[in-house]
């Protein structure tokens, strides 16, 4: 049986919020079966919990924000991408502020944290959402689609009219039966244009952004001294973002996601459209792991 997974141990980290610039304390904790991923604002009394579900998404302007009433948690997508990539079904994410720390702008540090905490299988079957037919949403020349696929695949195309992007791959398709999320996707960093960052800072956004946690592009090229981690790091980061956004379904996917210039808003619209169209998907479990179209790394012991 493919079983649900949680963390073996509690683990903590400190970072800054990308948009707030605030110092944030992050604690990842194990959770019981069928809990899902739950964000907890530990700085509030009483603590406010926000389950990582598509219906709890509020603002999607620059990141994916979860809301519960007037309480929010910003920038959840990179941590959720790491949770999805490592097959974590159940965990509590405690935060001391309203934003998940940006770390280095990728999911890599979160992968390291989760692997350091160790993974533990739980005595309950892991639930997958299997796509049964195509579902598409479009808006302003952007498109996001689910199609049936025996496995998990993410295809993405970006289209930036800028020399840095024109000279590099702007499309990628990753089939996770043959490609490692950890090696090929998790280290892709978020990116931004110098001109946009100056505008955002005037509006009290991207206050924590720097070349330490983002790829910064100006009219001449990439400003980061070390350059890119992957030749196709820009589109790979869009795939990373999409994996995090898709995990707001609450379960791992069996199917393919195709994005064309899609962002957090359209990704969430696609999830909501899928949820409403109940004939387009089903929940499945696997008694025999060898028959499943998706496999996960064996649980690792805590470091």
UniProtKB/Swiss-Prot annotation:
GO terms for biological process: lipid A biosynthetic process. Its EC number is 3.5.1.108. It is an enzyme of class 3 (hydrolase). Keywords: Hydrolase, Lipid A biosynthesis, Lipid biosynthesis, Lipid metabolism, Metal-binding, Zinc. One of its GO terms (molecular function) is UDP-3-O-acyl-N-acetylglucosamine deacetylase activity. It catalyses: a UDP-3-O-[(3R)-3-hydroxyacyl]-N-acetyl-alpha-D-glucosamine + H2O = a UDP-3-O-[(3R)-3-hydroxyacyl]-alpha-D-glucosamine + acetate. The active site is at 264 (proton donor). Pathway: Glycolipid biosynthesis; lipid IV(A) biosynthesis; lipid IV(A) from (3R)-3-hydroxytetradecanoyl-[acyl-carrier-protein] and UDP-N-acetyl-alpha-D-glucosamine: step 2/6. The keyword Ligase does not apply. Zn(2+) binds at residues 78, 237, 241. Its cofactor is Zn(2+). GO terms for cellular component: membrane. Disulfide bonds: none annotated. It comes from the Bacteria. HAMAP family: LpxC. PANTHER family: UDP-3-O-ACYL-N-ACETYLGLUCOSAMINE DEACETYLASE 1, MITOCHONDRIAL-RELATED (PTHR33694:SF1). Catalyzes the hydrolysis of UDP-3-O-myristoyl-N-acetylglucosamine to form UDP-3-O-myristoylglucosamine and acetate, the committed step in lipid A biosynthesis. Belongs to the LpxC family. This is UDP-3-O-acyl-N-acetylglucosamine deacetylase. It comes from Pseudomonas syringae pv. tomato (strain ATCC BAA-871 / DC3000).
């Amino acid at each position: 049986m493919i079983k649900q997974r949680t963390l073996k141990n509690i683990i903590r980290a400190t970072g800054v919020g990308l948009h707030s610039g605030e110092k944030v304390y992050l604690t990842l904790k194990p959770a019981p079966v069928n809990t899902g991923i739950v964000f907890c604002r530990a700085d509030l009394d009483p603590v406010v919990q926000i389950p990582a579900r598509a219906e709890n998404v509020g603002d999607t302007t620059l990141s994916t924000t979860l809301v519960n009433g007037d309480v929010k948690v910003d920038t959840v997508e990179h941590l959720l991408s790491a949770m999805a990539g490592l097959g974590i079904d159940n965990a509590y994410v405690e935060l001391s502020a309203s934003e998940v720390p940006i770390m280095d702008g990728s999911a890599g540090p979160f992968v390291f944290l989760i692997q350091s905490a160790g993974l533990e299988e739980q005595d309950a079957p892991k639930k997958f959402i299997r796509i049964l037919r195509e579902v598409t949403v479009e808006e302003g020349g952007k498109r996001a689609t689910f199609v049936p696929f025996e496995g998990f695949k993410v295809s993405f195309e970006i289209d930036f009219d800028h020399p840095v992007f024109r000279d590099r791959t702007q499309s990628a398709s990753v089939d996770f039966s043959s490609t490692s999320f950890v090696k090929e996707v998790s280290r892709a960093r978020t990116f931004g244009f110098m001109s946009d960052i100056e505008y955002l800072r005037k509006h009290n956004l991207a206050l924590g952004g720097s070349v330490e946690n983002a790829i910064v592009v100006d009219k001449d090229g990439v400003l980061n001294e070390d350059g890119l981690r992957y030749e196709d790091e820009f589109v790979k980061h869009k795939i990373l973002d999409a994996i995090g956004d898709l995990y707001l379904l609450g379960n791992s996917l069996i199917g393919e996601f195709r994005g064309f210039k899609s962002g957090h808003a359209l990704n969430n619209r696609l999830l909501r459209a899928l949820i409403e169209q109940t004939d387009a998907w089903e929940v499945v479990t696997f008694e025999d792991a060898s028959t499943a179209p998706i496999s996960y790394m064996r649980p690792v012991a805590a470091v």
